[in-house]
Amino acid sequence: MVMAQQQKNAERNDEHTRRNRSPSVDSVSRVQQQSGGFAFYNQQSNHQYQQSHPRRTSFSRDGNTGYYNNHSGNKRQTYNNQRGGRSYNHRGNSNYQQNGEYSGNQGCVPKYHQRNQNYPQLQPKYSYFQPHQRPIFNSTQGYGTYSVRRSSPPSPSALSSSTANSTSNRAPTQPPILLRHAEPASDKNHQGSDHEQNHDPKIHLYRSAGTAPGGYTQCPSPYKQPPPQPPSTPSSSDKRIEQQQAEDWPTRFQHPPPQFRRGQDPMPASIELQHKTANQTMPVDIVQTNQQKTVSSYERAAQFRASASELPTDSVDAKHPCFANERMQSALIGISPQLKTQQQSPGIPIQNEAEASAVMKAMRSFQFHNWPQMSHGSYYPMPYHLENQMRPMKSGDQLPLNQQNHNLSGFPAFVGKSSLVGSSLNTRNSSEADPEEMPRIMEKLDDEVTGADHDKTIDENRRRIHKSQEPRIGTEEKALNELPRKANRRNSSCSSISSVSESSSPSALDESTLTKILPTDNFRGGRGFASPSPPTSLLSEPLSRMDVLSEKIWDYHNKVSQTDEMLQRKLHLRDMLYTAISPVFPLSGLYVVGSSLNGFGNNSSDMDLCLMITNKDLDQKNDAVVVLNLILSTLQYEKFVESQKLILAKVPILRINFAAPFDDITVDLNANNSVAIRNTHLLCYYSSYDWRVRPLVSVVKEWAKRKGINDANKSSFTSYSLVLMVIHFLQCGPTKVLPNLQQSYPNRFSNKVDVRTLNVTMALEEVADDIDQSLSEKTTLGELLIGFLDYYANEFNYDRDAISIRQGRRVERAALAVRPKIHSNSEGDKETPPPSSSASTSSIHNGGTPGIPMHHSISNPHFWRSQWRCVCIEEPFTNSNTAHSIYDEMVFEAIKKAFREAHGELQHNHDLDKLMECEPIKASTTNTGAAVFAATYEGERPLAQQPNTIACASLRVLNSIPVSSGPGHYHYQQQSNQNLSRPQRPGSNQGYQMNNNRGFNGNNQQQHQNRRSFNNQSSSNPGNGSTGPRSSRSNENVRDSSRQQNSQKGSSGVSVSKENVASTTGVPVDKKQQNSNRKDDGNRTKRSPMVQSPEPAKTKSEKTPMASSNVSQ
């Protein structure tokens, strides 16, 4: 009896083990055939979903065993079984779209959650190799599919027998892709094999791209080419297969997985980098092993290059773009001692120690400074062929990676120091530099600084745009210092930084002066870009008051400008945030935008980030809030995050404060606001065009801040609007300094260009313009500042004209203040911006929130007319008014008076100190703001969630109730997940139902029903007189209004606090909106919706203005 029971238990355990282990090749094929190539999993309960019943593709709604079917009311996901992938319901508050449109015949499933790695899943055909996983070779598909669960490779005998027929008559036509197994096999399926006991962990398998499906052969020793096979005549179908494989080969394997990122789990010691293909870049600066040994990525790269030199290259075109890039990478990354004696392959150009020494010398001056600036590094995985998501990030895709050719990588070129002085934009990527000319360039490096050929370069106020030639692989190219330049530039006569005398020599400049002009890192040095430098010399004698004013402007700019150390800290913080966000949005890109990178920032500037999750327009009212809610919930478990605020402005942002040592940096994160990336790209070129642009902007922004006219919450200018005003003055003022880049380079600065192809390091071709260089270069900084104040105080007609840097001139207000059409996909409306893009970017560029409440939109005719009321500053890409926050006539008159007073003061005494010693304008205005959802952490931080609660955590954030904080404004309070499956009861305040379909209600739109109102705390207890927002973290009705505090402890450990920021919107309050949610004895008293407890009604004489707190900038 006991034996029978034991035997039955053993059989049950074997069956359980068989179902949960990684599927073998046969089981994978069987699952693919029966279920269309897909295995479905229950992501909530974190267990394999009906693996034994692959035909069952529907999900049960009972018992929390799977995602529910499509339900438009609760915005849940739906699965698309016909296409073989899952698509998400793009409605309202749902898990944001991660459409996995994979073909059903590839045997793959949607991308798994990064923390949910215990599912045996099949990856797409063109997948990156994850070194912590073990491959499973599917002989019927012709490529390796990978499983998250560790499993041993098939036995060598099985591989050789299964592929002997397919590889016997064909020679490799392309470089093989190495797959190294570093650990002996331990799978139960192979323990009985004769070859398993003697399996050599160093056996390497390689697959040639030209082999037949399943063409894997065993190499007897590492990195040795198998004996050549006799050639055969392939059929027409084989030729088509080979041609397709040849086209796909450079992109067949994507970048390494997120495990390579900084600060991630240490890499296993048994895993080496030999699996990386020749066209991949190094992932990180530091890689750790299990022995806690710190190994530089340069050393690992050198090892990889040494091993890669033994790759078979008989039938490889040495001029292939991938190998052209390989030559540059080999030169930049490092030289291994093994390369000095081994025979060099086409990918290794270093021939002797002299070249190696030259390359190492260049590495000390030119680091990898291009790709990680605006976006995350190229080692983050990206999807490949999804229409509604980001494509795989390749070199050039993300700003500021160079080149749109995806096979080329964005490394800087070797240029002389004189080229860096001549133009801050003169950098090329690796494809533009011939490795053979590098030693010659490096030998001339010192001569270029002190040589007679460059005596006019350092002390010359030359323009920042030079002609460049389009690179071509395999052809002879000229170095940057040999490219044609516009000659006969006159030296600037700006006496504050006047030119060097004829007797002066560039060699006389001391080292400290050269350090300021020639940063060791052109892109990162100093200000994110190498700031355009004026001529370097002492002031001319005798000095005038204008000279002193110009010198003070320049000194102030150098004092407040963003330093290189601050930029590095911001970039490191960006990497930390992306590491935390990528598990939730693994197919996204995180861009640095705004003043931190466009050249106009300082050390106190916030860092603005843009999370791009799709290349389509995103509804900023609804979908963007959902995305930011997910990020807020994710970051609450990160210890380096101190607090978060979700600001529901016109462009919603998530304001993040950090713990030490990053407590002095504030991050404003927005979702899919691509216009911020385009603006950053455009302003980068304007700021680098002439050396006088940045100092002038720095002084104007500081003066406006001290004068109190640089705050959108107080009906004044934003920093972005001030920058556009300075650029417009330099384009249309008495002395023209800047051209119109959008007209001169329409293909470069167009709103149709994909933001992932934007590049801020490529030089622009020289074009003809109407700028008088002789007059422009004589104008000093002091004269430009006085002219700027005079232009906007006396010359500019605010009633008739509008500012437009897109057209490079003053335009009539009537031409711009035309109500645009609602966004359409028709051919005639391609240029019309969508509603989500027409929002002001003030919250992106200066951390502020737009002054007009978010419920206003272009669909409201009154708002569209009112936003052009006072001053019109056209946004260069969306054609909206960036100064729409200035709607108060009294404040606008005070602003114009401030310009007149400043101009008179500076024109009279030329004293910058007195200009800065000004008092704020005296104009009373109601404070404007947006709803704020603040999340602070008190006590112990919530524990990190287990993998089986990841899906539930996302749903908990999605099912948050908006609580009214003013007419048309809502902030969110998390609630229990129990309301998902319960019916909606009148007055229970459990749902997310509103009469209007947009999710937000404006003053003139449909009103809430009383039973659906979010302002009604408890309609089941109407006698309490409470009108404040109801805290619905549980299903109990709050009967005592005194229990409503400013912060309520949530079930997840997050304290949610309300700020009365949006209690005053600056617009008349709709009486119907206030009275619809309140019942009195026939007497309806006007009251702010943000009142938390009942209070006596006030008479008209006792009414006081509604108080509000400022949104911290």
Curated annotation (Swiss-Prot):
Catalytic activities:
RNA(n) + ATP = RNA(n)-3'-adenine ribonucleotide + diphosphate
Q: Which residues form the PAP-associated domain?
A: 780-816
For this record, the Gene Ontology CC terms, alphabetical, are: cytoplasm; P granule; protein-containing complex; RNA polymerase complex; RNA-directed RNA polymerase complex
Where is this chain primarily localised? cytoplasm
One of the GO biological process terms: nucleus organization
Q: Which GO terms describe its molecular function?
A: ATP binding; metal ion binding; poly(A) RNA polymerase activity
Q: Where is this region: Disordered?
A: 1-113, 134-175, 205-266, 445-513, 817-854, 966-1113
Keywords annotated in UniProt? ATP-binding, Cytoplasm, Developmental protein, Magnesium, Manganese, Meiosis, Metal-binding, mRNA processing, Nucleotide-binding, Transferase
Q: Does the keyword DNA-binding apply?
A: no
Name the Gene3D superfamilies on file.
Answer: 1.10.1410.10, Beta Polymerase, domain 2 (3.30.460.10)
User: What cofactor does this protein call for?
Assistant: Mg(2+); Mn(2+)
Query: Where are the compositionally biased (Polar residues) regions?
Result: 60-106, 972-994
Q: Which domain of life is it from?
A: Eukaryota
Listed disulfide bonds for this chain? none
According to the UniProt entry, which residue ranges have a biased composition of type Pro residues?
223-233
Q: Binding residues for Mg(2+), per the UniProt record? A: D606, D608
In what tissue types does this protein appear?
A: Germline-specific.
Name of the top EC class for this enzyme? transferase
Query: To which protein family does this belong?
Result: Belongs to the DNA polymerase type-B-like family. GLD2 subfamily.
Q: What job does the chain carry out?
A: Cytoplasmic poly(A) RNA polymerase that adds successive AMP monomers to the 3'-end of specific RNAs, forming a poly(A) tail. Acts as a regulator of mitosis/meiosis required for progression through meiotic prophase during oogenesis and spermatogenesis and for promotion of the entry into meiosis from the mitotic cell cycle. May act by regulating and activating gld-1 mRNA activity in germline. Required for polyadenylation of neg-1 mRNA during embryogenesis.
Q: What is known of its domains?
A: In contrast to other poly(A) RNA polymerases, lacks any RNA-binding domain. RNA-binding is mediated through its interaction with gld-3.
What protein am I looking at? Poly(A) RNA polymerase gld-2
Annotated source species: Caenorhabditis elegans
